């Protein structure tokens, strides 16, 4: 067949395109991926037919699917589609703008080449206009109404008459020093000294040959130093240099047409203002604007904007981040950022706000206003953009900290790609691959296996911490594992979570400052939950799947959320409670824990762990902030690529059933609830595991492990994932494409994934002090966990509630502070079939 990679890549389009045709033919409304694949696949077939031009196909692509054939969200998200194929004249790009542009489309064209029967017209419902209201669209932005934003507020302005005597068009950008513009522009250059156009940052004014325009100029800000351009007026703005500058203009042949001194006060010249909606489209939402998170019922309101109106950073042709404009000149790399993320909406436990994010040496070096302090207002001294700075456009994007999954069974290395594609950048757990022990427990036992697993994970583009086996009432083996590099210890009932083992394990954790995680005794063999809690002796411990379906004292392990030394987490199969939750769990549990349906006691053990009442209560306790963390239990009763989306589905369900939180009442937004839920998979696991000094939040001094989202796909599929400020995974098109947006657009590993030092190997301090980990030949950055033992529930951000718990041992009814914790199972959730093909 002699195929090459670009041909194999296109097979994804054909496979999914034909799948989408089959679904369409049986009356299923298509989601974004299906609709994009169907149109792309048909275009490829029409290209192969050889009868159509690029222009023909650009038109045909808009006629295949109508609004009735796709889910309402697709009309908003599928605004452009690009394919490349081999025409009789070679490879060319076909761009289809607004592919869903009619109600009815053309099913004959949509099912082209499939030989499938065309379904009756009444198979698909008539589009309901209410489904397409702006506020119902995924990632909707609702700017503050009836307000305008003033650009470059408080600065001096002038008006100048400008005539173009050139024979070609001249376009001048917002931040180009106006005195330095094309010599064929005729105007009073001395009056323009120290000024630039008073227009939105990154826009421009175009002068066609012979044009005469009156433009408004505004003073440059910052240090007021001119650099770059034509080097006519370089240096600090100083009117005493006027004669010198005039002579240079004359020598260099720049047209200068003096104007009479203005009679009106420059303060009377109105500044440029922008409609809030137009501003949001260009630079992203700003203070007071509302943003919907995906298709959930959650809305955030921007709390503040650290950028400066009129001096925003914008990269591209004619934009602001150019030499001598938004990019400063004559500065060393030591003074400038390595990378800047511009105009990002940050969603973090620390706030929900708009800012530029500065990255240097793999760390978040500053958050605020970036740019060129020589001509821009409010530039943070640690956020200078220079010729050594790269740019990631964050406008109309959301940036969060990389997610942290603290419950990983290292069953297969391919988990990393799934997790990265969902926004997870840190794994903590144990195992040795698909061994029987690892299929059930997160333990890497013994120093040999510990070393081998640490070495095996060295090339994975994700932060990793390996947990040892803590089930040993004698401490010698546990100490060996810690000294071999264990970042924590796991107690699991399948290895025997007895009070004696718990006591010894916690002693060793206290001695070496590592965290203890526990899966308690479902059998109640050594005692009930009270005996296990007693064995903790008020020492800090992280309780896994605290509800109990994932394992733990039946039926009341959930009661441990009341204790100040317990750091409770959930695993995601029970998140949130739905009509299907109970039915999937029995078989899941039997496989995971090596049980047999032929042994009645095994079946009874499994059934004792699956209780609708406690799963429903888990929903409520998350919303109260009593369960502090979310994790997966990867391939061992959990899904490593769904920690984040199930967190937000839980938040959505709780808002739908329980209403706004008290803290959010009257705000018109859900900021408090959003901070509570994002903390569950970012900052709180980082605090619990002794890693929050470097990861877990979007804060200065932390590793630049960041996830960039389109608001419309928030919580499901990130646009890009950064590790130490370097892109490790991104939605990326055909590598042979003329541009990076050619279908199929797939989450793919990027260059950062091949730089091991962008990720951390978390180990114990003892393993570093003994020089053991250094002998492993690792390329990853080695860091010790710390401050694991003197923390408690009080340290869990937005999730520190400790209600007095009661669980009825017969009915399983759960009460918190005397209030019934009950929730109905969801019949549908937002972050599901609109986003995923399977």
From Swiss-Prot:
Superkingdom per UniProt: Eukaryota
**Catalytic function, reaction form:** urea + 2 H2O + H(+) = hydrogencarbonate + 2 NH4(+)
Q: What binding partners and quaternary form does the record give?
A: Homohexamer.
Provide the residue positions that the database annotates as binding Ni(2+) 2.
Answer: 490, 519, 545
The UniProt annotation places substrate binding at 492
Q: Which organism is it from?
A: Aspergillus fumigatus (strain ATCC MYA-4609 / CBS 101355 / FGSC A1100 / Af293) (Neosartorya fumigata)
GO molecular-function annotation terms?
Answer: nickel cation binding; urease activity
Q: What is the name of this protein?
A: Urease
Necessary cofactors: Ni cation
Q: Which gene encodes it?
A: ure1
Q: Which residues are involved in binding Ni(2+) 1? A: 407, 409, 490, 633
* Family, as annotated: In the C-terminal section; belongs to the metallo-dependent hydrolases superfamily. Urease alpha subunit family.
| Recorded metabolic or biological pathway in which this protein acts | Nitrogen metabolism; urea degradation; CO(2) and NH(3) from urea (urease route): step 1/1
